[in-house]
Regions:
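Single conserved hydrophobic/aromatic residue that forms the stacking wall/gate
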Residues: 163-168
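C-terminal, loop-rich substrate-recognition/catalytic regions characterized by aromatic stacking residues
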Residues: 1-162
Length: 168
């Protein structure tokens, strides 16, 4: 038989999905917009709205990709594989991490297809890293030490760039 063009595991429904094309023909393009006060919305902001944010990065204190201490990568007791789905609340209150959240969703949202983060940024440094994560946020009453073995992070990407003085 013919193999699917793309096969994905949908964590919310705990099912495998098989697609004849990628992105799936049935996928609807939706945009999420940064809004004031850390809000994220499917509604496009007004043209004259000032939806920018800023932070100061300290290269001597980089943002960790997982909570400290970090165990050995492989071997007995290694938690290397599940770090992809670890709770990210440990960095939420850092002054060099920006976060936006939607209001609680009133219906299920499935994210499938090509995901693009469009950022407009400037830096006073000679290089910068911007990391964008799309995360399903747990309610505050969920403990921080839950384990989601077998689930995969839906989006995690890193783009590095070197800037020169002619770019702002």
């Amino acid at each position: 038989g013919k193999f699917a063009e793309a096969t994905t595991f949908q964590t919310g429904s705990n099912t495998w999905q098989f697609y004849d094309s990628w992105p799936p023909a049935s996928a609807e393009k939706k945009a999420l917009y940064f809004r004031e006060h850390g809000k994220l919305s499917f509604a496009r902001p007004e043209e004259n709205s000032d939806n920018h944010d800023s932070y100061v990065s300290d290269p001597a204190r980089p943002v960790p990709y997982r909570a400290r201490p970090v165990e050995q990568t492989y071997g007995p007791g290694s938690r290397w594989y599940p770090w992809l789905t670890e709770d990210q609340r440990f960095v939420h209150n850092r002054p060099d991490v920006l976060s936006w959240e939607t209001d609680p969703l009133d219906k299920q949202v499935t994210v499938t297809g090509n995901i693009i983060a469009q950022l407009f940024a400037s830096t006073t440094g000679s290089d910068a890293d911007f990391i964008v994560k799309l995360i399903d946020v747990y309610p505050d009453e969920v403990p921080q030490d839950i384990h989601m073995g077998g689930y995969q992070l839906m989006v995690a990407d890193r783009k590095s760039t070197r800037l020169n003085s002619s770019h702002t």
